[in-house]
UniProtKB/Swiss-Prot annotation:
Purpose of the protein: Forms an efflux pump with AaeA. Could function as a metabolic relief valve, allowing to eliminate certain compounds when they accumulate to high levels in the cell.
Tree of life domain: Bacteria
UniProt source species: Musicola paradisiaca (strain Ech703)
Name the UniProt record assigns to this protein: p-hydroxybenzoic acid efflux pump subunit AaeB
Gene: aaeB
Pfam families: FUSC
HAMAP family referenced in this protein's UniProt entry, alphabetically: AaeB
Localization of this protein: Cell inner membrane
């Protein structure tokens, strides 16, 4: 059998088993709505598969399941608090629920992307509980407990199905990606030392940026897979920092070569020009480079020496990750040498727009439902909250909303066939019911791995509109209300995204660039504790977001890279201890923070001019302290860079 077909069939079987097992156990334990367990199993297993375009890693499935449990608990708690405080005022209760959904979406847009699902789920879980139980508020505590139980059952069934069908470990992919990343780092160094075209260097750098980010995502999946991988997980965090450092130092070498300050010649240049295509060749090449560097260290540029040192640390950590052995004393010193600085979100305005979309959409929908008494209103409201909560953090919310809409349109005829022909023919047989649902899930599971538009939405929507409750009833009007309500909810969500436009792209890009300016100035310090802080992961995270926002804007990309390189250069400077210089550092950091957080262009320009003035004064203080020429030159280079790009950073 074709190697690409077998994993798809395996995942389709895994998905079918998870959905059928959760449904059967839900009926076996006499739960009131077993479809919630089946729906949870489908979403937790199929969501990562749709993103990956194939059989997802076990850690990704478990991570998704854990996030769903946490989000459900938070949402149930929020629903109970809202009910207890406003049970005598139904309209106020629904408005508070809409406000809760908007706040949760706002928070989900500020946290890390991999954790945003928790708060998005918490928002619409409270909406589901309150809207579904609005007619009988006294039953809401029992309703919340049942929902939590059924969701936990669905997640347990997904994990069991994953274990039955050979869980896919991410470890081998991590090992291959780490070797490939080091090879790419060396090829970037070759381009920066040689005379490669600027576009070629940018393309290589961009590829390394995405590879390093991908390994960061694998790191989280590896820990969720098993606690056995914790030593490798710890090493990977520092290994990523070494990767950022090697990229930065290679870029600094390229800038120095362009300015004529970095000349690599002789045997070292000949060695660097030799092509390297395999990890084995790379190891031999690096050994020879270190041997030459040890004998000619005084004549080599400092960034090249730093790059070789970082590559040695990278190889040591990579070997430990490969074997997952106990962390040695030398590795402990590397792990504890620096303190990574966490990046704060630069998408505050974007997050506010996302929360506003969800809050306004659900509030208007609730008022319309209450005024008209529309029979499909509750389902429409739930779908409106679900879509607006889940798609906002995605790179293209409009396309994701269209995917939901297409899925609900597919679910109408598919669900009608299942509801009116297939399910009644099972004659209340749990075995036949499981077989029918399993076959449907198997077919859709194959399409999900192809990332077919509407496939994931079709699976979730079809399971949701089928009356998989205990006891099962076949009410055609209720089925049509649910199906039509889902479609109208998706249409309204799509309309909300189109009407409430997000114009924060330019503002977020400017904020990211000014955060990079602040990071560059953070490299100036005389305090040992501050010098140990590693800002590179946070700075490259800002750069990655900037590339996603402006994929074709090479001017912003190169400015951001230049600021990161300047930060690394300033961080390596040996600035003498002085109260005057330390006070200058504090003032410049404070002013740079004001530039990044300024509300308007006028205020930002004023703070930026103040920052340039402070940097000129700082250069004068450096001259008075008779510091080394390289320190003065590095500060002058940063000042010139800011003056040259003042328009891009302020307007």
């Amino acid at each position: 059998m074709n190697s690409s077909v077998f994993p798809r069939l395996r995942f389709a079987c895994k998905l079918s088993l998870a959905v059928v097992l959760s449904l059967v156990l839900g009926f076996w334990f006499e739960m009131e709505t077993p479809r919630w367990a089946a729906l949870t199993a489908a979403i937790v297993a199929a969501g990562p598969a749709f993103v990956a375009g194939g059989d997802p890693f076990s850690g990704a499935i478990r991570h998704r399941g854990l996030l769903r449990i946490l989000g459900t608990f938070i949402g149930c708690f929020g629903a109970l608090v809202i009910i207890m405080t406003t049970v005598r005022a139904p309209v106020v209760m629904l408005m508070l629920c809409c406000l809760w959904a908007g706040v949760c979406v706002w928070i989900s847009s500020l946290v890390k992307t991999e954790n945003s699902y928790v708060f998005a789920l918490a928002g619409y879980t409270a909406l589901i509980i309150i809207i579904t139980s609005q007619s009988s508020p006294r039953a809401i505590p029992q309703f919340a407990i049942e929902r939590c139980s059924e969701i936990i059952l669905g997640i347990v069934c997904v994990i069991l199905a994953d274990l039955v069908f050979s869980p896919r470990s991410v470890k081998q992919d991590v090992d291959r990606a780490i070797d490939d990343l080091l090879l790419g780092q060396y090829q970037l160094l070759q381009r920066c030392v040689g005379r490669a075209a600027t576009d070629d260097v940018d393309s290589c750098w961009h590829g390394l940026l995405r590879k390093t980010q991908a390994i960061g995502g694998m790191r989280n999946i590896l820990l969720m897979e098993s606690s056995h991988w914790q030593p490798a997980w710890r090493r990977m965090k520092t290994l990523l920092s070494q990767s950022w450092m090697m990229m930065t130092l290679a870029g600094e070498i390229g800038l120095m070569r362009r300015d004529g300050d970095c000349v690599v010649k002789g045997g070292l240049l000949m060695l660097l020009e030799q092509p390297v295509t395999t990890p084995g060749d790379l190891r031999r090449q690096l050994r020879q480079l270190r041997h030459l560097a040890a004998s000619h260290s005084s004549r080599l540029p400092a960034p090249l020496v730093g790059w070789l040192a970082a590559s040695s640390r990278y190889q040591l950590l990579a070997a430990g990750i490969r074997t997952n052995a106990r962390i040695s004393q030398r590795e402990t010193e590397i792990l504890e040498a620096e303190t990574p600085v966490r990046a704060s979100s630069a998408e505050t305005h974007h997050a506010l727009i996302n929360g506003l979309r969800t809050g306004v959409a659900t509030a208007v929908g609730c008022l319309f439902w209450l005024l008209t008494g529309w029979t499909s209103g509750s389902v429409c409201m739930v779908m409106l909250g679900v879509v607006t909560a889940l798609v906002m953090r995605l790179p293209n919310p409009l396309m994701a909303a269209k995917d939901f809409l297409i899925g609900t349109l597919i679910a109408l005829p598919l669900g009608a066939v299942m509801f009116m022909l297939v399910l009644p023919a099972t004659q209340q047989s749990l075995l036949l019911l499981g077989l029918c649902i399993g076959v449907m899930t198997f077919v859709i599971g194959i399409e999900i791995q192809k990332r077919r538009l509407g496939s994931l939405g079709a699976l979730a929507s079809t399971i949701n509109i089928l009356v998989l409750d205990n006891p099962m009833t076949f009410n055609l009007s209720q089925f049509l209300d649910n199906a039509i309500g889902q479609i109208i909810g998706c249409v309204l969500a799509l309309a909300v995204i189109m009407l409430i436009r997000d114009n924060s792209r330019a503002r977020t890009g400017r904020t990211l660039l000014n955060r990079l300016v602040h990071g560059a100035i953070d490299g100036l310090s005389t305090r040992p504790a501050r010098c140990r802080e590693n800002h590179l992961p946070a700075l490259y995270q800002h750069l990655f977001l900037l590339i996603n926002l402006f994929p074709g804007d090479m001017a912003k990309y190169r400015l951001a890279l230049s600021l990161i390189i300047v930060h690394q250069r300033l961080r390596q400077l040996d600035i003498p201890l002085s109260d005057t210089l330390a006070e200058c550092h504090r003032q410049m950091r404070a002013t740079a923070a004001r530039v990044a957080g300024a509300a308007g262009d006028t205020q930002r320009s004023r703070y930026f001019s103040q920052l340039l003035t402070q940097m000129e004064e700082y250069r004068q203080h450096l001259g008075e302290h008779q510091v080394a020429d390289d320190i003065v030159a590095a500060v002058a280079r940063l000042t010139a860079l800011l003056q040259r790009h003042q328009h891009a950073l302020c307007d």
